[in-house]
Amino acid sequence: KTMSSVRVHPEVLSALAEQRPVVGLESAVITHGLPKEPRPELLQQLGDPFATKSHLPVHLALAEVMEESVRESGAIPATTAVIEGELVVGLTDAERHELAHHPSAIKAAPHRLSTMIATKATGGTTVGGALTLLHRGHPDLKVLATGGIGGVHRGWINRPDISADLTVLSRTPLMCVCAGAKIVLDAVATFEALETLGIPVLGCGCRSFPRFHAPGDGTLPIHCCTPPEAARIAQTQWKIGSAGVLITQSPPPPWALELETLETVTQKSVASVTASGPDATPALLGALDQASSGRALLANLALLRHNAVLASVLAAEHLQPLHHDL
């Protein structure tokens, strides 16, 4: 066993061996993306399964909801993380707890993985980190669910802050399910970068690039398709290249925000935040949560669960023999 090998949970390995669907999950959302204290009123507003966990800190409640939602949708969850320098696909309950309560968890982006292994560090994977672990962990892991991908930051002209989520997705043959790019990013620049990198962008039930907490406004058109069609397009994509496929859906209607309102609040938040680098996005999302009186956080949690369910459907579709005889 080499230092850089990936430990895959036995449950995940047996599901893959039996051709049962598996959904990969990132964990920076747990370590960096959400409040680490309980917000019982907020979680109760969302109803079950969040309401039953309203006593838990938000980040831990979400971690459990994601795994349970995948299971209820007929797939096996494989949460990725770096635990004491080990690359892990499929956390135990104890590891999930350790990760959520770790006092100095690192954001496990691709450029940090080797240092984290060498220093035996612990941290939550970004989309780019999760894609790397899933692809190295087992070639049949084909689906990752997240909230919103990283991309090109607002103000990129002054500081070219571009997430490795994009470059890693461009060379890793997985489906990544999201609600578009995080709202704190430049959606147009991110959309253009996806095209430049040769990453197909599909919409399940939507015709324009969703804006994370809000649906798209029609300005960034994407190919609208059903989950079986999306799985077939992904299969076709991997016959002609190694780029991943970005599969988007709008946030669920009762919780979605209106784009105009969201944009106004986001611009205020962006102006108020000075953090840069890996701390930028968590700080911006925190400011947005406050400025929107918690509505952005409600939408964020709802769309995360929504994406876990779609990812489970896609993981099952991917296994249908129909998609292999192209």
Model-derived features with residue positions:
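Short, ordered loop/turn segments at secondary-structure junctions
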Residues: 27-30, 82-85, 148-151, 179-182, ...
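Anionic-ligand binding region
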Residues: 213-238
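A C-terminal functional module that forms or caps the active site or interfaces directly
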Residues: 237, 243-306
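N- or domain-start disorder-to-order transition segments that initiate the globular core
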Residues: 2-19
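Divalent-metal (Mg2+/Mn2+/Ca2+)-assisted nucleotide/phosphate chemistry catalytic cores
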Residues: 90-173
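Short coil/turn connectors at secondary-structure junctions
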Residues: 17-21, 25, 72-77, 111-113, ...
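Active-site glycine-rich loop that binds ribose-phosphate moieties when present
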Residues: 124-127, 156-170, 175-195, 226-232
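Glycine-rich nucleotide/cofactor/substrate-binding loop typically near the N-terminus or early
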Residues: 27, 32, 40, 44-116, ...
